[in-house]
């Protein structure tokens, strides 16, 4: 009987530990592979997600590079505004409702980036490198390229 309890305890602990190690956000690369980029909902989520990662990047570089931090926060706000515009057009939401929803979602995604960035920092002393966060940044940078 003690062996069964011990085995159960070990299994439960390993499940908990694996859950605690999991990233809070799914990689944008994986997300976009599973979604249709032509759909408004996918575009809206992508804009919110990119807004969150630029806000996160702004906070990371704030002390070392105030100019880049300011640029990142401007990009973040522009992406969030574009998501609000799409929500008003595609989902027929009122402007105030769309703004509130977009800001709430960005805060959630931003918090996830903070938590995952801290985990990555503990692992390899980088907020971005070696994690999905750097891949997300590359994807999001393509949205802001000037043609």
Locations of the language-model features?
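Short N-terminal segments immediately surrounding and downstream of signal-peptide cleavage
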Residues: 21-41
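Classical Sec-dependent N-terminal signal peptides that target proteins to the secretory pathway
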Residues: 1-23
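Short N-proximal segments of mature Sec-exported proteins
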Residues: 36-92
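Compact alpha-helical subdomains of small soluble proteins
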Residues: 76-147
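Stable alpha-helical elements in mature extracytoplasmic
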Residues: 24, 43-50, 133-136
């Amino acid at each position: 009987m003690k062996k069964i309890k011990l085995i159960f305890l070990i299994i439960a602990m390993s499940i908990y530990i694996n859950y605690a190690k999991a990233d809070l956000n799914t990689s944008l690369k994986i997300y976009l592979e599973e979604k249709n980029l032509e759909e408004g909902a996918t575009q809206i989520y992508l804009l919110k997600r990119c807004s969150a990662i630029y806000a996160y990047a702004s906070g990371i570089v704030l002390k070392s590079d105030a100019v880049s931090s300011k640029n990142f926060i401007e990009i973040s706000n522009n992406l969030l505004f574009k998501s609000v515009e799409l929500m008003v057009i595609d989902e027929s939401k009122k402007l105030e409702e769309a703004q509130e929803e977009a800001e709430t979602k960005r805060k959630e995604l931003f918090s996830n980036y903070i938590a995952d960035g801290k985990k990555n920092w503990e692992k390899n002393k980088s907020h971005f490198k070696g994690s999905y966060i750097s891949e997300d940044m590359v994807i999001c940078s393509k949205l802001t390229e000037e043609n």
